[in-house]
Structure formats: C-alpha cells, structure tokens
Amino acid sequence: REICLPVGLKEIGDWAFAYCSNLKKVVLPKKDILLGRGIFKECEALTDIPHLGETGIRAEQVGKLLGAVPTKLEADYLFSPKEAGERVWLSRFDDRLREFLETPDEDGYTKMVYCGEEDIVANMDLYLAERRRAKSRLCFLRIMNDTELSEDFREKLKEYLVSHTKGCASQAAWEVAFKEHGNEQDYYEAFAKVGCLTEDNYDAILSEMGESYPEMKAYLMRY
C-alpha cells in the first residue's frame, strides 16, 4: 500500500509497480530520476506521490497532484519528481487539466472499441458517464489542493462541478463525492463550497443519502 524510495535512487525500471492494485502512496526523492515505461500502469488506487523529507500543507498538496499524473491526468510528460511543485510545473499541470476538461467527452471511445475493449466500454452512455466522473475527480482534486491555483481557473473548475451536480443531466460531481468518497468530509465541504448544494437539490441529496454516512449527512444539513 505504501513504498518509500531512498534518496540515492537513480532509476525506476519499466513496469516497476505496474498492476499493484493496492498501492496508494509512493514517496520519492525530489531529484532527477531515470524513469522507465509503464511504471504505475493500472495502479488505480495510487493517489499520493509526495517528496521524501518534505512536510507542510504545500508539500502534501503537491504529493496529491503528482499522484494524479500517472493514473488520472493522462500526461506522462508531467511526471517529474524534481520539477513537481515548482510554479512552472503547477502551471503546466493546470494547462493539461484545462485541456482535459475541454476535450469532448466522446473522444477516445472509437479508439477503445477498435482496440477490442468493448467489454470495458459496453456502450457510449457508460463511456460518457465515466469521462465526466474522471473530469469531476480532477476538478475536486485541484480545488482541494489549490497551491498556486489562479482565481480564473478556480472558477472554471467550480463551473464544471456545478454543471454536473445532483439534478443536472449529468450528476458526475455528486456521484464522485457520494459514491466514491462517501465518508470523507473534505469532499462534502468542497461540494457545498463550490455551489453544488442548492435549494433545488438539497432534499434530493439528503433523500439519496438515506441512512448512509450519518455524520456527512448531518454536516450537509448544518451547512
């Protein structure tokens, strides 16, 4: 679930941690490292790649952002332990996230079908729903780890989440918060703070929560 690599590390070979489905955290030294192919392929649980020996809120947030690069952001060129957290790197991260949000949801579907992945993508509707959840996950991630986040881009992230909240044609933002992070208050706090909890969907949200996560339900009722 967690690996800490030493400061003397020089290289990570091809497929080093590929298919480690339970791997959640990898601590890396902030230095140039020769990186092989597919290091974290199919490591779906991986969410945190902090720098060795660094502490504090900024360091924690950078670890979360770097952790998203190999598994969620589809941008191998951003996986640079040495550059991660620098202002230029954060700007490039946001540029890639902006590009991802602006990419039509249907992009990539035909390619996956041609590659024989019909069993994974049963139909277009399921594919589109997952793409919107993927975008919502990254919007939440960046808003909750907002080091060097510009106000203009913050508004764009908020707009995406609000347009995919409970009651919208796509409820991806609510699905991510409730179904994937049901007992994590940070997500409910972000969900409510950006404007996803409204007078129009308040009752429907509490109704869907039912008896699940009573503390989180109480939090929303107090908000």
Question: For the regions a protein language model found, what residue spans apply to each?
Answer:
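Structural signature of tandem-repeat unit edges
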Residues: 1-11, 21-34, 44-149, 157-182, ...
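N-terminal cationic amphipathic segment used for targeting or macromolecule association
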Residues: 14, 205-207
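Ankyrin-repeat interhelical turn detector
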Residues: 182-183, 212
